[in-house]
């Protein structure tokens, strides 16, 4: 294991003892928020501390056992013992690298947030809108299966079903971390119901997954930088629909970003939702710029997450889904569309974590 990683582990070990002492402090016990934060950190550090202690003990055993190889009568037995110790040491090193990745300082801070999901129909006309509806159902069912709260922020229906565009909010602490790799272009291949010759048509949708940032962390938007338009809602809502201009359209003038919300009957609530989406988009755009400047690792492995990147193809006649970023194919399309999204999520997350482990083991840790 690299000296830089050992140094990092020793620093975390010292922090473990420090936090342990703090948790025994009566003043800390009176501060519930600080106690909660320290308890969470202690739980993370405990696993690292325990594993690192085990690694140190095995390393010491290797140092003690090694010189015994010089005894001809014990050589074979000692060599066998050393082989076992080195194998155990290698296993512990992999566990330590994984634990380091799970440490907050090495994770995307947005992973534990909720998220907004934007699905837009692309090329393919009515079929693209229908496919956008399929994707929305897929994400909705996944959220329901895992007891996440899902709220529709804005929806523009297609003329024959589905959606031209739909924006939803997933309220769960780990929603963004689970779904962030869904960003990009999704392509569908299937035979439309109106196709009399049985020909397969290709359509596409784009998906953007944006972290739901806490209000205090959102970028400040100057009133001079936005234009707010009101219009009558065109969605569901009974007699109230089209009687008042409760729907909101906000345009961010410096960037040209446009957000609409007509889900609520209250103009005030629609504006609040639209501003939340706009702020999250601006924050995501800033983060994307930083990622471009600082690192290309994620882009090289998993695509940039830009809407122009084709990340996945859904072939309905064959029941096949292919994730082009990692060359993963499954023939469980119907299950995925009905919400078993982990079939696709687990391989992509595992591939990403493997790449992080490689980068962590090859680079200096500060």
From Swiss-Prot:
Keywords: Cytoplasm, Methylation, Protein biosynthesis. It comes from the Bacteria. The modification N5-methylglutamine is found at residue 239. Methylated by PrmC. Methylation increases the termination efficiency of RF1. HAMAP family: Rel_fac_1. Belongs to the prokaryotic/mitochondrial release factor family. This is Peptide chain release factor 1. It comes from Baumannia cicadellinicola subsp. Homalodisca coagulata. The gene is prfA.
